[in-house]
Amino acid sequence: MGILTLNVEEKIKIISKNTAEIVTIDELRKKLEENQKLKGYIGFEPSGLFHIGWLIWAQKLKDLVDVGVDMSILVATWHAWINDKLGGNLDKIKLAGQYAIEVLNAYGVDMSKVRIVYAEDLVKDSNYWALVIRIAKNTSLARMKRALTIMGRKAEEAELDTSKLIYPAMQVADILYQDLDIALGGTDQRKAHMLARDVSDKLGKKKVIAIHTPLLIGLQGGQRMEGVEEDDYLASVKMSKSKPETAIFVHDPPEVVEAKLRSAYCPKGVVIDNPVLQINKYIIFAKDNATLKVERDIKYGGDIEFKSYEELEKIYSEGKLHPLDLKLATARKLNEILDPIRKKLESKTEFTLLVEELEKGVTR
C-alpha cells in the first residue's frame, strides 16, 4: 500500500504498532489530518556493537519512512565522546557510526529517504550552542541531573566531569535546532524528550511529538522489585552491549544465536519479562505477514505455524508449547532476519576489523 493511499488512521496504526507510548497521539493525529509534511529524527550514540534490541527502533524508523515522514538519523558522535564511549576515541566512534548506518541499510531501511546528520554538523554552528545555553538557563540543575539516565548513567555520575551535565541540554538542542515534529527513541530517552517538550514552550519553539519504543529485556530475564520505578527497572535489565552475555548481536553467527537463545530465560508458560517472547513480539512479528514455524516431533503434536504474536503468546501461556521448541524456532527465524546484515558487514573489511576490535574489549 503506497503512502498516498493511506488514510490518517492507517498511518497511526502503522506508527503506533509496537510502541510503548506516543506523547501525544492527539497531536500526531492533528498534524496528519492537516496533511503536514512531518519531520522526525532518531539519535544514537555510535558506541559499539549493534545488538538486536536496536532493531526495535530501526523497525519504527522504517515504519515512519514508509508512511512519508521526513526522517533524519543523528549520529551522536560528540555525545558518545562526552559519555566516554570507546575510550573517548572520536575516530573509533565515527567508524562505529558508519557501521550502524550499514546495519540499518542491510536491515531494509530505505536510506535514500533518510538524512544522515552528524553531531559535527550541529556543533560547528554557534546558533546551536546558543540554544544549548538557553535550554540550560531554563532547566534546573536537579532536573538536568535526573535526565542523565538518557546516557545510561545515574544522577550522581554528573560528578565525573562537567560535560556530563551538558549532555541532556545538547540532546534537547538536537531536537529544537532541527525544528522537528517527531522525536523517536527508546523509553530510556523519555526524560530528554519530556524536557524538550517543556522547554519548547519557554523558548517559543515547536513542541515535538515523542514516540517511544520498548526496551528489549536481556537474555537473563528480569527480577522485579517493589518500590523500583518502571523506567529504572527496564533500564537495569535491558539488553546491553556492555553486558554481552545478555545480548544477541547482529553479527553473531547462526550457531551463536541459537546457543544464546538455548540458554535464555524462558520458563514454561511464563510471558512476563520473557526475552524469547519479546524477540518474537518486537522483532519477528514486527514485520508484515510474519509467521513462526515451530518444528516438533509428531508425538509432541507435530509442526505448528503461528501467524500472529497474540496466537503465539496465548498458546505459550497455556503451557502448550515447550520452551526449547520456542527457542529453536525463534533462533531459525531470527537468523533469517540477521542473515543479510551479517553478509553486508562481512563484505567490508573495515567493519569486520571493527567488530573484532570491539569484541576484544567491550566498553560502556
From Swiss-Prot:
- Report residues binding L-tyrosine: 41, 167, 171, 174, 189
Which ranges belong to the motif 'KMSKS' region?
238-242
Q: Which Gene3D superfamilies match?
A: HUPs, Tyrosyl-Transfer RNA Synthetase
Cystine crosslinks: none
This enzyme's EC code(s):
6.1.1.1
Principal location listed in the UniProt entry: cytoplasm
Q: Which InterPro entries match?
A: aa-tRNA-synth_Ic (IPR002305), Rossmann-like_a/b/a_fold (IPR014729), Tyr-tRNA-ligase (IPR002307), Tyr-tRNA-ligase_4 (IPR023678), Tyr-tRNA-ligase_arc/euk-type (IPR023617), Tyr-tRNA_synthase (IPR050489)
Alphabetically sorted, this entry's keywords are: Aminoacyl-tRNA synthetase, ATP-binding, Cytoplasm, Ligase, Nucleotide-binding, Protein biosynthesis
Source superkingdom: Archaea
Residues binding ATP: 241
What is any one of the record's Gene Ontology cellular component terms? cytoplasm
- Record's subunit section: Homodimer.
Its protein name is Tyrosine--tRNA ligase
What organism does the record attribute this protein to?
Sulfurisphaera tokodaii (strain DSM 16993 / JCM 10545 / NBRC 100140 / 7)
What is this organism's lineage?
Answer: Archaea, Thermoproteota, Thermoprotei, Sulfolobales, Sulfolobaceae
